């Protein structure tokens, strides 16, 4: 594991510890996983890969809709609530936030979690990620994905 990837995973882990989020990951806008929090087992990694692909598809469709309204705007964030409100323990939310043009932060958490806290901590994590990447822009992890800035 590269040093940068390890630092990214630490940021994702801290997001979970600070918020009660069940999963946090960095993904590309093509649906590829860059980094996932370290508390994942093999089954969770497969679920995250599927969520990453689905999130990329949702993002792409939403961006097309935004382009129809105003072609000069870029989608910044999507929040998806899932569940029937019959069993709040199983209802969940997916929050997808753009970090760079091709890198997204995907967070999955119980619907009953404080969304304001999630937004606050996610924004802190995004700032940390951007600072890390600026410090180590030559790292292969991001160079393979393309230009970030």
PLM feature spans:
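Acidic, low-complexity cytosolic segments
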Residues: 1-23, 33-149
